UniProtKB/Swiss-Prot annotation:
L-glutamine binds at residues 356, 384-387, 407, 473. This is CTP synthase. Belongs to the CTP synthase family. Residues 295-547 form the Glutamine amidotransferase type-1 domain. Allosterically activated by GTP, when glutamine is the substrate; GTP has no effect on the reaction when ammonia is the substrate. The allosteric effector GTP functions by stabilizing the protein conformation that binds the tetrahedral intermediate(s) formed during glutamine hydrolysis. Inhibited by the product CTP, via allosteric rather than competitive inhibition. CTPSs have evolved a hybrid strategy for distinguishing between UTP and CTP. The overlapping regions of the product feedback inhibitory and substrate sites recognize a common feature in both compounds, the triphosphate moiety. To differentiate isosteric substrate and product pyrimidine rings, an additional pocket far from the expected kinase/ligase catalytic site, specifically recognizes the cytosine and ribose portions of the product inhibitor. UTP binds at residues 13, 191-196, 227. Pfam families: CTP_synth_N, GATase. Residues 1-270 are annotated as: Amidoligase domain. Mg(2+) binds at residues 71, 144.
């Protein structure tokens, strides 16, 4: 029978509940347990798909096509299991389900209320999500509740967790509370009062934390932990210090060294083998001891909040681990390029344009792509980054000078990128959309397999088939592909049914490494395995760096 660990947060948000939950899951998995994770989001949106990245951060896409919270990306990077749609749900989904049941008459005329109807629905969603992977036989389900204790939005979720802990047998439920212990410079000490108040608020709801994770910028001394224990009524050995580190991949070892996994196993009466965190130790060692260093220019429009590109940033770091390279990322606002030109792109080892939506900043991205193409700088375009690479090539090489996307110009004379109105989803069902369709869940979403053209760079990277996750509405327009191909562009993969371009590249005679993909490869990269595309990209950056250095040395001699 599955046992549950609820992870809550207090004092402030963004303390790292997702990292804490994923790290605990990684330790338990290393002990031979089957672990799954759930994210319970208190916002009323049905999913984060229509939310601005500047508000919410990245939207992580699961294999089965769900638009979910970015924490699910952390989950997949820390454990071996792949998350599903039911591993993330929101207040919006809960109310949508309850209201649908009420309309169908399932409540038999009763007054529908937060307690018991909403809280019971939350519990049903939790139990369903816990069965989503491992053939429904997970040993432990770690459930992260979004927001902080005291938020009105989180109360139904906390109440549902409290009810669930009462309903389940003894030793089947534990609570982990992550809280802030701030350091006050003027006083020269860590302050425990916010943690005390946060735990007090949790106890008022009826929840007693099993473990306290105390977040600070430095390790909390023993006397500080003892004080927190005394005033919070949590055993001292269960007060765990979590401090700032240079990489999140150090967190599993940090928690294990303080015995957190033993505490949880005892509380849940789990019989597990000793933890083996050697894979994490190796990753941390590789990150700390690189043999090379490159600088990648990431040209986007959400760069002021790097959480917007969380999986992409991590994928580049994973590639660095697997190529023994320190990867520095220079975040460049594409609107700055529109105002000030491309001088900021000089001295970069490679350029990457990530996915995005809307017209703002696109001409700056196109200018960056042109710079990369004309100066032989390795280029990787992802989703919109591929579409813009096609537009740039069409305008400046294929003599389609008015080339554009109907996303930016619905009346474009040369729509080399356009809205596709009908396609088959990953299950083979026909999906349709138009300009008047709702924005939510009207994209090509989830994994899709495609054959890869032999003899291409794509084939060298992926082999005969690619299976990656998608999130986009617009596609390269097949009407213009013959003209683009006559000008040298290579379409190296197409969807098997609609034959829509999935990957594009330039031949080595035109550019040493110029590559675009319609999908999002960052969603399948993990620190343990890396990802072949990002490893190839970093290798291309290293090769470009060597050529530049050789050229400079040659010029110096002459």
């Amino acid at each position: 029978m599955t046992k549950y660990v609820f992870v809550t947060g207090g004092v402030v948000s963004s303390l790292g509940k997702g990292i804490a939950a994923a790290s605990l899951a990684a330790i338990l998995e290393s002990r031979g347990l089957k672990v799954t994770l759930l994210k319970l989001d208190p916002y009323i949106n049905v999913d984060p798909g229509t939310m601005s990245p500047l508000q919410h951060g990245e939207v992580f896409v699961t294999e089965d096509g769900a638009e979910t919270d970015l924490d699910l990306g952390h989950y997949e990077r820390f454990v071996s299991a792949k998350m599903r749609k039911s591993n993330n749900f929101t207040t919006g989904q809960i109310y949508e389900s309850v209201i649908s049941k009420e309309r169908r008459g399932e409540y038999l005329g009763k007054t529908v209320q937060v307690i018991p109807h909403i809280t019971s629905e939350i519990q049903a969603f939790v139990e369903r999500g816990a069965k989503a992977i491992h053939d429904g036989k997970a040993d432990v389900a770690i459930c992260e509740i979004g927001g902080t204790v005291g938020d009105i939005e989180s109360l139904p979720f906390l109440e549902a967790a409290r009810q669930m802990s009462l309903r389940l047998p003894a030793h089947d439920c534990a609570f982990v509370h992550l809280t802030l212990v701030p350091y006050i410079n003027s006083a020269g000490e860590l302050k425990t009062k916010p943690t005390q108040h946060s735990v007090q608020k949790l106890r008022e709801i009826g929840i007693m934390p099993t473990v306290l994770l105390c977040r600070a910028d430095r390790p909390i001394p023993e006397d500080g932990r003892a004080k927190i224990s005394l005033f919070s009524n949590v055993r001292e050995e269960a007060v765990i210090s979590v401090w700032d580190v240079d990489t999140i991949y150090k967190i599993p070892e940090m928690l294990h060294a303080q015995g957190m996994d033993d505490l949880i196993c005892r509380e849940l009466d789990l019989k597990a083998q000793p933890a083996d965190l050697s894979v994490w130790a190796k990753l941390v060692y590789e990150m700390a001891n690189p043999q090379h260093e490159v600088t990648i220019g990431m040209v986007g429009k959400y760069v002021e909040l790097t959480e917007s590109y969380k999986s992409l940033i991590e994928a580049l770091r994973h590639a660095g681990i697997h190529t023994h390279t320190r990867v520095n990322i220079n975040y460049i606002d594409s609107e700055d390029i529109e105002k000030e030109g491309v001088d900021c792109l000089q001295n970069l080892d490679a350029i990457l344009v990530p996915g995005g939506f809307g017209k703002r900043g696109t001409e700056g991205k196109i200018a960056a792509i042109r710079y990369a193409r004309e100066n032989n700088v390795p280029y990787l375009g992802i989703c919109l980054g591929m579409q813009l690479a096609v537009i740039e090539f069409a305008r400046h090489v294929a003599n389609l000078t008015k080339a554009n996307s109907t996303e930016f110009d619905p009346q474009s004379d040369q729509p080399v990128v356009a809205l596709i109105t009908e396609w088959l989803d990953r299950e083979g069902r026909v999906e349709k959309r138009s300009n008047d369709s709702d924005l939510g869940s009207t994209m090509r979403l989830g994994s899709q397999r495609c054959p890869v053209k032999a003899g291409t760079l794509a084939h060298r990277i992926y082999g005969a088939e690619v299976n990656e996750r998608h999130r986009h509405r617009y596609e390269v327009n097949n009407t213009y592909v013959p003209q683009l191909e006559r000008s040298g562009l290579i379409i190296s993969a197409r969807t098997p049914n609609e034959e829509l371009p999935e990957m594009m590249e330039l031949p080595s005679s035109m550019h040493p490494w110029f590559f675009g993909v319609q999908f999002h490869p960052e969603f399948t990269s993990t620190p343990r395995d890396g990802h072949p595309l990002f490893s190839a990209f970093i290798s291309a950056a290293l090769e470009h760096q060597k050529k530049l250095l050789k050229s400079k040395l040659h010029k110096g001699k002459t």
